[in-house]
């Protein structure tokens, strides 16, 4: 029987530990009890739905005793800790008690012997808890004890912290004396500060610490004495970090993300005025060109149109200018139009990839200038004709850098280099210099008319659409013999410092209006022919195409919208063809 009861107690103890892991043993138990509660409003007892076995147990943490009723009816059990606030009263077969929340309960026992035994055990436990609480109160009020910690307690957290602090200070002082003897005055000063704080503590504590070898410090004393020692070192480290910050920031400043690798160069300082970057910053030559002067006629005409007069900014990181490009930096005003345009193509500096060198807001400003100003419209059309339409092939939009390099090498190898002379930069251009030369052959006239018919509708469609991809910083070879005098004036003013007369701008206005009038009704045949002429000959590799597409899709929302528009157009065309 004893073995069976012991096995049952072990099983019951394991079940109780699942609810409270601090339970160590079972002090007593009884078989059948029921719980009643007293209702003060009705002044009567009410039976609860708790009925089962009563266990009195011991715990390893405060409160050190408690009792519970394991309910047989449902999952709601009674758990009551035993402390000094409990009050018990015996009325056979009931054991009444009141807890700390002033709730009155009554435990009904099936066996009266169990009721007496449990009542006696509860009285002993309550007396022990009362004695323990009184001892704890006396320990807090005792002047010989610091922070209410008694000697017989097994764990003292403040004592452990103070001991660790002393060991750390001794190790730090030994390391500083061995490694750097020059720091001894500072350690002596810190030692003086620590002794001063120790002198402020009561003499009784110092005598006790000298005898026992342990110091009892408060939290303020423990963490207050270490602050003056750590503060100078922290300040010194912060000052060193501040001194190193400017150099590190200048050295580790990340450059803009590029899909391709380019050669870096120390470009000149960028202008901060409306994103304008002078042309002298894109070359390696030390000389600086003089600013372009605009005549009053051009100022009045541009103010009426309210068009911005700044050009599309270029990125300052560029490859060095070739000697042939430097020799053609300034074009004479008396040269024919075709020669001047070839010089403009040659003098255009080599640029980084336009996919990352030009932000989207600047493109929107450039497209606004192209749609409002009649002087800049032909130049913008020739620069961005292949990138403004959604129907243009996407590969043609992505082959920007290779096509630009190929055009530059072809123009430098085949075209005649114009003689460079500096005195002509300050001369005034005459109206005769802008007169078109007579056409040589009928084929040239036909190509000029076809290209004019293509470029004008491209310009009108570009004005109605937002910029979808970054503009190409080049002049297409197919559009070189086609553009009118407006292209000549804009290019020569951007490259050299030629002073222009008012009659030139009047002539460009009339010619641009004539071009727009002629190109009002383009044919599909001419559009297809021009697209075939503008098709690049260099094909990107798979890796370059992948990097470029990933970069544009992640960083350019307009490019993604362009892809979606092209996809919708192709889808609608396929549906229409299927319906037909």
UniProtKB/Swiss-Prot annotation:
The modification Phosphothreonine is found at residues 348, 401, 526, 529. (Microbial infection) Cleaved by porcine reproductive and respiratory syndrome virus serine protease nsp4 after Glu-238. The cleavage inhibits DCP1A function. One of its GO terms (cellular component) is P-body. CDD domains: Dcp1. The keyword Transmembrane helix does not apply. InterPro entries: Dcp1, mRNA_decap_C, PH-like_dom_sf. It is found in: Cytoplasm, P-body; Nucleus. Residues 132-141 have a biased composition (Basic and acidic residues). It comes from the Eukaryota. The keyword rRNA processing does not apply. Residues 253-264 have a biased composition (Low complexity). Residues 173-196, 343-359, 520-531 have a biased composition (Polar residues). Forms a complex with EDC3, DCP2, DDX6 and EDC4/HEDLS, within this complex directly interacts with EDC3. Part of a cytoplasmic complex containing proteins involved in mRNA decay, including XRN1 and LSM1. Interacts with DCP1B. Interacts with DCP2. Interacts with DDX17 in an RNA-independent manner. Interacts with PNRC2. Interacts with SMAD4. Interacts with UPF1. Interacts with ZC3HAV1. Interacts with ZFP36L1. Interacts with NBDY. Interacts with DHX34; the interaction is RNA-independent. Belongs to the DCP1 family. This is mRNA-decapping enzyme 1A. It comes from Sus scrofa (Pig). The gene is DCP1A.
């Amino acid at each position: 029987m004893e073995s069976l009861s012991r096995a049952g107690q072990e099983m019951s103890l394991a079940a109780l530990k699942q609810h409270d892991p601090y339970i160590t043993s079972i002090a007593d138990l009884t078989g059948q009890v029921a719980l009643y509660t007293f209702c003060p409003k009705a002044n009567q007892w009410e039976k609860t739905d708790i009925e089962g076995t009563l266990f009195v147990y011991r715990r390893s943490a405060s409160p050190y005793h408690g009792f519970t009723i394991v309910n047989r009816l449902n999952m709601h059990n009674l758990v009551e800790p035993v402390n000094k606030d409990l009050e018990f009263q015996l009325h056979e077969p009931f054991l009444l008690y009141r807890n700390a929340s002033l709730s009155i309960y009554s435990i009904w026992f099936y066996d009266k012997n169990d009721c007496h035994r449990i009542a006696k055990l509860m009285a002993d436990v309550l007396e022990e808890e009362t004695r323990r609480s009184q001892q704890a109160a006396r320990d807090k009020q005792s002047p010989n004890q610091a922070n209410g910690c008694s000697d017989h307690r097994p764990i003292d957290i403040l004592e452990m912290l103070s001991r660790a602090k002393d060991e750390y200070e001794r190790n730090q002082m030994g390391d500083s004396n061995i490694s750097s003897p020059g720091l001894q005055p500072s350690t002596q000063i810190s030692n003086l500060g620590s002794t001063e704080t120790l002198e402020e503590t009561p003499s009784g504590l110092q005598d006790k610490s000298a005898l026992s070898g342990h110091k009892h410090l408060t939290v303020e004393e423990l963490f207050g004495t270490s602050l003056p020692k750590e503060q100078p070192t922290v300040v010194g480290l912060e000052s060193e970090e501040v001194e190193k910050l400017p150099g590190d920031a200048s050295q580790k400043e990340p450059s803009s993300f590029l899909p391709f690798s380019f050669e870096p160069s120390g470009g000149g300082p960028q202008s901060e005025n409306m994103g304008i970057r002078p042309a002298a910053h894109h070359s390696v030559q030390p000389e600086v060109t003089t600013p372009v002067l605009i005549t009053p006629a051009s100022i009045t005409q541009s103010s009426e149109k309210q068009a911005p007069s700044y050009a599309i900014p270029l990125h300052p990181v560029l490859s060095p200018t070739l000697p042939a490009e430097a020799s053609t930096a300034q074009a004479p005003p008396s040269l024919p139009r075709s020669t001047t345009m070839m010089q403009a193509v040659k003098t255009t500096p080599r640029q980084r990839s336009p996919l990352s060198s030009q932000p989207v807001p600047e493109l929107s400003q450039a497209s606004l200038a192209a749609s409002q100003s009649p002087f800049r419209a032909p130049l913008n059309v020739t620069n961005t004709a292949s990138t403004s339409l959604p129907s243009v092939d996407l590969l043609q939009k992505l082959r920007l850098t290779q096509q630009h390099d190929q055009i530059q090498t072809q123009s430098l190898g085949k075209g005649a280099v114009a003689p460079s002379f500096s005195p002509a930069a300050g001369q005034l251009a005459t109206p005769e210099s802008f007169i078109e030369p007579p056409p040589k052959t009928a084929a040239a006239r036909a190509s000029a008319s076809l290209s004019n018919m293509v470029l004008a509708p491209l310009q009108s469609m570009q004005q109605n659409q937002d910029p979808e991809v970054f503009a190409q910083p080049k002049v297409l070879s197919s559009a070189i013999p086609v553009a009118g005098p407006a292209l000549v004036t804009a290019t020569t003013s951007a490259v050299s410092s030629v002073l222009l007369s008012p009659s030139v701008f009047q002539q460009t206005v009339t010619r641009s209006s004539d071009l727009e009038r002629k190109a009002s009704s383009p044919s599909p045949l001419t559009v297809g022919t021009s697209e075939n002429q503008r098709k690049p000959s260099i094909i990107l590799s798979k890796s370059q195409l992948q990097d470029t597409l990933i970069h544009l899709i992640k960083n350019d929302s307009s490019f993604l919208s362009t892809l979606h528009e092209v996809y919708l157009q192709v889808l609608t065309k396929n549906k229409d063809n299927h319906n037909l």
